[in-house]
Regions:
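Cytosolic-side transmembrane-helix boundaries in multi-pass membrane proteins
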Residues: 1-43, 49-60, 283, 290-298, ...
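Short loop segments and helix-boundary regions at transmembrane helix junctions
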Residues: 25-35, 55, 128-138, 159-233, ...
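Hydrophobic core segments of alpha-helical transmembrane domains in multi-pass membrane transport
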Residues: 36-53, 118-125, 146, 150-152, ...
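Single transmembrane alpha-helix segments in multi-pass membrane proteins
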Residues: 50-57, 61, 65, 72-156, ...
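Transmembrane helix-bundle core of multi-pass membrane transporters
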Residues: 69-72, 78-85, 198, 202-271, ...
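Cytoplasmic juxtamembrane regions at transmembrane-helix boundaries
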Residues: 126-146, 269, 274-277, 372-376, ...
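Helix-loop-helix "hairpin" substructures at the membrane interface of multi-pass membrane proteins
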Residues: 178, 246-325, 350-351, 355, ...
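Transmembrane alpha-helical segments in multi-pass inner-membrane proteins
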Residues: 307-310, 316-391
Length: 429
């Protein structure tokens, strides 16, 4: 009896084996230390600086303005300040000025608000990667979380504050999980590629939101039928704020939920049986199947958990600062797509995703028109710079996949190894 052939290892000669893009990327991300992502970010910013220079502006001044616009310079403003102790009337000494009238403090608040959903959408992509799946559907899962979150948040107005918040967040997370599980189920049962199905689900989620909150839609605002927007969520469904003016997008407790997501991501993958099975399937699904692990079950669970992270991000944004959802919000949002760059730059690890999310959060806030001096860098170029750096990160991280594809396809285009010429007659063998 011959043993079933298992899939070749990911670092094997690719001449006879070409793993999926997702599995190859996941393997690449696990290999090596922190040097590669750091170099990826540095090179991306250097090339961005070349573009800035080509427009006639000073790259150093531009990046300095972006850094200050992100509010991260707040940590350098050390002095003698005080901070209010919650639930008391006392103040204690603190290193930094927490008054959000201070420009750096306000900008930092905006950076952290942007970082919060990026952490969760980054985890949504990273968790699927660890199972060898490429979750392009973080955007659709995020949108489903926002749709369900705004619906629950604007209803059940008689509920107490904490139960209402927990109920809305739970429903938003479950909506994202269901949306992700659909792609996982199709992958597990009929072999439908998750990239195709998640892209399709992104569009379905977008048009569901556009219909529900559009003109004469079933969930359009009851008091203003001229505006394609949802009802505002109830006051008792809003997340508690930690820092800043609640009417000016104050920092809310969602940042702690996102950090909790990072911890949960690490514990699930490294301290549970489920995590072991997910990683085993990600390394080699055939070997995992031979070892008694249900590959189909893990495909579904991995995509469901990925969707849960993204749906939770949508619920947090709605309950934390957005408070309503319009057709324009649905159609222009790209938080889920940025999560792909966050996961790749963070090498699909909890710490890496957290740091990458902070980097992109600061970049997006720092390049916003409210943060940049037009004389330093024109607003019309600022947003494009942020998009270009995201694209460069994806390009550099995925470059090895291109090399692998060319290498494994060289025979098809006539570039394979040439057979050795036959030995002359009478030659020694």
């Amino acid at each position: 009896m011959t043993e079933p052939q298992s899939q070749a290892p990911l670092d094997a000669d690719p001449e006879g084996y070409a793993p999926s893009v997702a599995r190859r990327l996941a393997f690449y991300q696990r290999a090596g230390g922190i040097v590669t992502p750091i170099m990826t970010a540095v090179v991306a910013f250097l090339m961005g600086g070349i573009v800035v220079l080509s427009t006639g502006h000073n790259p150093w001044r531009t990046y300095k303005a972006i850094f200050e616009g992100s509010g991260l310079n707040w940590f350098f403003h050390v002095g003698s300040h005080s901070i209010h102790v919650p639930f008391t009337g006392t103040h204690v000494w603190f290193w930094w000025d927490t008054n959000t009238n201070h420009t750096a403090a306000y900008n930092l608040t905006q950076t952290l608000l942007t970082t919060t959903p990026l952490i969760l959408t980054g985890l949504a992509v990273a968790f699927a990667f660890r199972c060898g799946l490429f979750n392009i559907g973080g955007q659709g899962q995020y949108l489903m979380g926002t749709i369900v979150g705004v619906y629950i948040g604007s209803r059940f107005t008689d509920m107490a504050h904490l139960p209402h918040v927990l109920f809305a967040l739970t429903c938003a997370a479950l909506a994202g999980a269901l949306w992700g599980a659909i792609a996982g189920f199709l992958k597990a049962t009929v072999g439908a590629h998750e990239v195709i199905t998640t892209i399709m689900l992104n569009w379905i989620a977008l048009w569901i939101g556009s219909y529900l909150f559009g003109r004469d839609g079933p969930l359009q605002n009851h008091f203003n039928k001229a505006v394609p927007i949802s009802d505002d969520i109830a006051e008792n469904a809003k997340l508690p704020t930690l820092w800043g003016n609640p009417h000016l997008q104050a920092l809310h407790v969602g940042i702690f939920i996102a950090v909790g997501g990072l911890i949960a991501f690490y514990l699930i993958l490294n301290r549970t049986t489920l995590g072991y099975e997910v990683r085993a399937v990600g390394f080699n699904p055939e070997a995992a199947r031979y070892g008694g692990i249900s590959v189909a079950r893990n495909f579904i669970l991995a995509m469901a958990i990925s969707g849960l992270f993204a749906g939770l991000a949508g619920g947090i944004d709605i309950l934390g600062w957005q408070f309503r959802l319009g057709v324009l919000d649905v159609q222009v949002s790209n938080i889920g797509f940025i999560g792909i760059a966050v996961a790749l730059l963070g090498r699909n690890t909890a710490v890496g995703v957290g740091l990458a999310a902070l980097l992109f959060g600061g970049l997006l806030t720092g390049t916003s028109t409210r943060s940049l001096d037009p004389e330093v860098f024109p607003p019309q170029l600022a947003g494009n710079l942020a998009l270009m750096i995201q694209a460069l990160v994806l390009l550099f991280v995925g470059a090895d996949v291109l090399v692998l594809t060319i290498w494994s396809s060289r025979k098809k285009i006539g570039l394979g190894r040439r057979n050795a010429p036959p030995a002359p007659e009478g030659a020694a063998t």
